Amino acid sequence: MPIMLNFSNGRILPESEVEALRNVARSNQSDVLLVGSRSLRLHHISFMDGFSVEPIPGSFLDRIGERRHRRLAESLERQLNGGSSFLQAFSQYIEQTSSAPPLQESVRNEVQSRVNSYAFSVNPGDFPCSVLHLSCPITLCVPETGVFVKNARCSKVCSLYDISALTEMLRRNASHPLSREAFTPGMIVHKEECNFNTTEQHFCILPRSDTRL
């Protein structure tokens, strides 16, 4: 059931309300918030005890006010993360916990170049799956700009990542969040090389593209 929230952009919620929201998110992992006529989705990222908030697209009038809708989500997200955006909190977490051996600069640059080349604007309607399968493993939100990444170096299963979150991981020399391996260029997959398997309910690499990777 959606949570009704009396909140507007620029308003500071009492700490008791902020903590109550955190606790609800910790219990449910994901919740829908109703702020007036606008809907937001709140996610709890348990491995770092962080919170991300994304606007849920609605009517045509909502889309006209998309910028205000996003600012509302960002304002609430900062309050839930103690003043930081989710990406800032994630960056701090990576800095504190990263223990991966440093990638050679040439390899890191090649991975980042491939990320930039393969990134695309995400339109959920283009995929034969629910938005659940389009959620970034880091932010738990559907990215505006995303890129497919293998779940492990030798895996044929892929997940969609938010390009900003992935770029931050590379900048911080963090390991792959699922396999804990160092990132390699071959882990970054072009959109056209991925197919959603409706039987197994995940994205996988098309057989004809194996030789490219």
UniProtKB/Swiss-Prot annotation:
It catalyses: S-ubiquitinyl-[E2 ubiquitin-conjugating enzyme]-L-cysteine + [acceptor protein]-L-lysine = [E2 ubiquitin-conjugating enzyme]-L-cysteine + N(6)-ubiquitinyl-[acceptor protein]-L-lysine. GO terms for biological process: biological process involved in symbiotic interaction. It is an enzyme of class 2 (transferase). Residues 136-189 are annotated as: RING/U-box domain. Keywords: Host cytoplasm, Secreted, Transferase, Ubl conjugation pathway, Virulence. InterPro entries: Effector_NleG, Effector_NleG_sf. Induction: Transcribed for 2-5 hours after treatment that induces type 3 secretion system expression. It is found in: Secreted; Host cytoplasm. Signal peptide: none annotated. Its EC number is 2.3.2.27. Changing residue 138 to K: Loss of ubiquitin ligase activity, increases interaction with host GOPC. Does not fully complement the deletion mutant. Disruption phenotype: Slight reduction in diarrhea in C3H/HeJ mice, no change in bacterial colonization, but higher survival rate. A motif (PDZ-binding motif) lies at residues 211-213. GO terms for molecular function: ubiquitin-protein transferase activity. It comes from the Bacteria. Effector proteins function to alter host cell physiology and promote bacterial survival in host tissues. This protein is an E3 ubiquitin-protein ligase that probably interferes with the host's ubiquitination pathway and targets host proteins for proteasomal degradation. Mice infected with a strain of bacteria deleted for this gene had an increased survival rate. Can be ubiquitinylated, and ubiquitinate ubiquitin, giving rise to polyubiquitin chains (in vitro). Belongs to the NleG E3 ligase family. Interacts with host GOPC (human protein). Interacts with PDZ domain of host GOPC via NleG8's C-terminal residues. This is E3 ubiquitin-protein ligase NleG8.
